[in-house]
Amino acid sequence: MEGPEGLGRKQACLAMLLHFLDTYQGLLQEEEGAGHIIKDLYLLIMKDESLYQGLREDTLRLHQLVETVELKIPEENQPPSKQVKPLFRHFRRIDSCLQTRVAFRGSDEIFCRVYMPDHSYVTIRSRLSASVQDILGSVTEKLQYSEEPAGREDSLILVAVSSSGEKVLLQPTEDCVFTALGINSHLFACTRDSYEALVPLPEEIQVSPGDTEIHRVEPEDVANHLTAFHWELFRCVHELEFVDYVFHGERGRRETANLELLLQRCSEVTHWVATEVLLCEAPGKRAQLLKKFIKIAALCKQNQDLLSFYAVVMGLDNAAVSRLRLTWEKLPGKFKNLFRKFENLTDPCRNHKSYREVISKMKPPVIPFVPLILKDLTFLHEGSKTLVDGLVNIEKLHSVAEKVRTIRKYRSRPLYLDMEASPHHLQTKAYVRQFQVIDNQNLLFELSYKLEANSQ
C-alpha cells in the first residue's frame, strides 16, 4: 500500500475506526477482547503514522478518542471496582431517585430483593446481566446464613409474580431479568412444590383512597419534571439498543436494558394517571384531576415530550377511567375539546398520520413516542429479509440507518428547563421519579365501579 493510493486506503480505514469508536464508546467495554483488538489496531496505526505524514491528524484524534472511551484491559486477578446503581424503585430511597440517571450496562451491579413464599426476602448484590442460575446461587448463599431451615434453599426456582397474581417461571439460562420485570412484579425464589401457592406482595394490592401528592403540585412543575426525567432516560438509551431490541428480541436483552427501562417508565406513567384518578373519591375533585392531567399533557406537548404526552393521554383513555361518565360531564367544555384533539393526535389510524405530522415540524430536543419507533423498525425488519440470495439487503439496512439517524437528530441539542425556581422543586422531583401505581386492570375496574356503578 505504498504511495498516494495506499495512504488513501489507510485514511479510509482509520476514518471508519474513528467513527466506530465515537458511536459505540462505552458499549465496547461490555465486549470481551474489545480492548485488546483496539489496542492492537492503535499500535499498528502508530507504526504507519511515522511513514505517512497524512495520518498524523487522524492518529491524534484516535489517541484522544481511545482515552475518552477508556478501553482498559483489566489485569489478571484484579476485580473491577464498580458502584452499585439504583433501579427505578431501589428501596424507595429519596437520594437514589434524585440522582441523574446514567446508562446501565450488563456488567453494572444493582441491589435486588428476592422474596420467599411467606413474603420474607433476602437482598442480593448482582450484575444487571446475571442469569437466573446466578441469582439463585446468590439467594442460596444468603439463605445458608439465615435462621431458616437448611432445606429451604434446596431445588429453588425463580418466579416473576405480578400484582395481579400472574406467575412466570424463569429458565436458568435467562439473563437480565431485572429490567424485564413488570411495574409491580417481584422475583420469588421457591421450590416447585410451593409454586402454585405464590401470591403478590400485600402492599401491591392495598389501596388507600384520599388526597395524594398530585393534588398539591402544579401542572407546570409536574410536566417539566416528567420531561426532564424522560430526557435523562432517553439519553441513556444507545441508538444500537433500538436495533438490538427489534433484530435480536430476548437474545439481546443484555444490550437493551436502558430501552427496557424507558418502555417500563412509559407504562408506569400511564398507570399513574389512571391510579390517581380512580383513588380520588370526591366527584368534584376527580373532575379537577382530569382537568389537571389534560393541562399536564398539553404542557408536555409544549415541551416536545411526546412520550409523556402519549402516556398521560393513554392513562386518561384507560377503560376504567373513560367510563366515568358523570365525572367527565363535570369537565368544562374547553377541556373536553382539548382532550378530543389530543385523542385525535394519538389516534393510530393511517399509520399515526397526525402524530407524524406534528413531530416532523419539531426541532430538537425532542422526546418521541418510543414504542412507535420500535413499531417502525419491526415493520422494516419483518417486511424484508436481511439476506437475499446470500447477499446483504442494502436497501433494508439503509432504511434502518435512516430511522437511527432520526433518533440521533432528536437528541442533537441539549434540553434546558428552569425548574429550580419552584419552592417545592426537590419534593416534586422525588414524587415524579417514584410513582406509586396500580397496574392490575381488574383492580382499577373495581375502583371505577365503586365510584360510578351505573356509568355507561
From Swiss-Prot:
Residues 218-454 form the Ras-GEF domain. The keyword Transmembrane does not apply. GO terms for biological process: Ras protein signal transduction. GO terms for molecular function: guanyl-nucleotide exchange factor activity. One of its GO terms (cellular component) is plasma membrane. This is Rap guanine nucleotide exchange factor-like 1. InterPro entries: Ras-like_GEF, Ras_GEF_dom_sf, RASGEF_cat_dom, RASGEF_cat_dom_sf, Ubiquitin-like_domsf. SMART domains: RasGEF (SM00147). Keywords: Guanine-nucleotide releasing factor. It comes from Pongo pygmaeus. Pfam families: RasGEF. Probable guanine nucleotide exchange factor (GEF). The keyword rRNA-binding does not apply.
